[in-house]
């Protein structure tokens, strides 16, 4: 009986924790394996991902993956992105195409903004 009670308590706590977790915004990084600018951007995107656990990062290779390429086309069409060049960074309704180390990091950080402050529980 105690085992069942303990299991029920843990199950209830799991549902409460899942219910409190808000969905995260998605940052899309579309790249090509043959693109030198994409390779230059990758370490920055990895760093950004570590800094911002509040955002879900999706790194999608488009030259060898038809599903990723189709998603890229769909997102580009919706946002009015012309040309389909990579790297392309998309966050919510904003986008940046291209990357040059030292020039784009600030623009990308500004695009995603600062993390929301969590409310202080009393």
Can you describe what each PLM-predicted range is?
Residues 90-121:
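Non-catalytic, surface beta->alpha helical segment in thiol-disulfide oxidoreductase systems
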Residues 1-5:
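Positively charged n-region of N-terminal signal peptides that target proteins for export
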Residues 75-85, 96-102:
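Thiol/disulfide oxidoreductase modules built on the thioredoxin-like
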Residues 20-58:
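Local sequence-structure signature of Cys/Sec-based thiol-disulfide redox active-site neighborhoods
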Residues 54-70:
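Thiol-based oxidoreductase modules, predominantly thioredoxin-like and allied folds used
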């Amino acid at each position: 009986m105690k085992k069942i009670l303990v299991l029920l308590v843990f199950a209830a706590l799991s549902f409460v924790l899942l219910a409190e977790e808000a969905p995260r915004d998605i940052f899309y990084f579309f790249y090509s394996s043959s693109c030198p600018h994409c390779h230059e951007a990758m370490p920055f995107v990895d760093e950004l991902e570590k800094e911002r656990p509040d955002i879900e990062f999706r790194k999608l290779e488009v030259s060898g993956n038809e599903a990723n390429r189709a998603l890229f086309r769909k997102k580009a069409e919706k946002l009015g992105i012309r040309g389909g060049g990579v790297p392309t960074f998309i966050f919510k309704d904003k986008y940046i195409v291209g990357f040059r180390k030292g020039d784009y990091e600030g623009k990308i950080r500004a695009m995603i903004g600062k993390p929301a402050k969590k409310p202080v529980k009393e």
